[in-house]
C-alpha cells in the first residue's frame, strides 16, 4: 500500500519532467584551447530572446549544475533560449573569462537566424562571480559583444 501511495505522489513529478520544454541542446566550443564551452538550450516555442548564463564559483570553479543547467527548463518554458557558459578561470589574467563571455555573446548573435533568436534581444546574467563577469561584460564590452539586457 505504501508503494502505491508513493507511486501516486511521484507520478505527477515524473510527468512534469517528461513535459520539459527544451527542444534542442547544443554544446559549442567557445575558446581556441577548448576549455570554454557554451551549452545552448533551445525552447520548443521560441520567443526570439536568449540569455547567456554565467555560473558562479568564486573564479576558482564553476557551479554549472545549479547555477547553469538547472535553469534551462525555467527559461525554455517561457520561450527563452538559455546559453550556459563554461568560462575559463582567470589565473591572474582578468581578460580570460571576459573574452569567453564576449565570444559567447558573439556566437549567439552569429547563430541567431539558425536558432530562431533576435540578434538584438540577447542578454546576460550570472551568479556570484558569474554575476561580476556579467556586469563587467555589460559595462565594458566592445559593441559587438555588449548584451542588450
Predicted regions and their residues:
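Active-site loop/turn elements of alpha/beta-hydrolase fold enzymes
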Residues: 56, 80, 87-89
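Positively charged n-region of N-terminal signal peptides that target proteins for export
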Residues: 1-4
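Short beta-strand element of the alpha/beta-hydrolase
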Residues: 48-56
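Catalytic nucleophile-loop/oxyanion-hole region of alpha/beta-hydrolase
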Residues: 63-70, 85-119
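N-terminal cap/lid segment of alpha/beta-hydrolase-fold proteins
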Residues: 20-49, 94, 98
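Bacterial N-terminal signal peptides
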Residues: 7-16
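Primarily recognizes the serine-hydrolase "nucleophile elbow" in alpha/beta-hydrolase
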Residues: 103-149
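A fold-wide structural signal in alpha/beta-hydrolase
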Residues: 50, 76-83, 123
Amino acid at each position: 500500500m505504501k508503494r502505491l501511495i508513493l507511486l501516486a505522489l511521484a507520478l505527477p513529478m515524473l510527468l512534469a519532467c517528461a513535459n520539459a520544454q527544451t527542444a534542442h541542446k547544443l554544446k559549442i566550443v567557445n575558446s581556441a584551447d577548448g576549455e570554454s564551452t557554451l551549452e545552448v538550450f533551445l525552447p520548443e516555442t521560441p520567443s526570439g530572446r536568449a540569455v547567456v548564463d554565467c555560473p558562479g564559483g568564486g573564479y576558482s570553479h564553476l557551479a554549472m549544475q545549479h547555477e547553469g543547467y538547472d535553469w534551462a527548463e525555467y527559461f525554455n518554458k517561457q520561450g527563452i533560449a538559455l546559453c550556459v557558459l563554461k568560462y575559463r578561470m582567470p589565473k591572474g589574467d582578468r581578460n580570460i573569462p571576459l573574452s569567453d563571455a564576449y565570444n559567447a555573446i558573439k556566437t549567439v548573435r552569429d547563430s541567431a537566424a539558425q536558432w530562431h533568436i533576435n540578434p538584438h534581444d540577447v542578454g546576460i546574467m550570472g551568479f556570484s562571480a558569474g554575476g561580476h563577469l556579467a556586469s563587467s561584460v555589460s559595462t565594458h564590452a566592445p559593441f559587438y559583444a555588449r548584451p542588450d539586457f
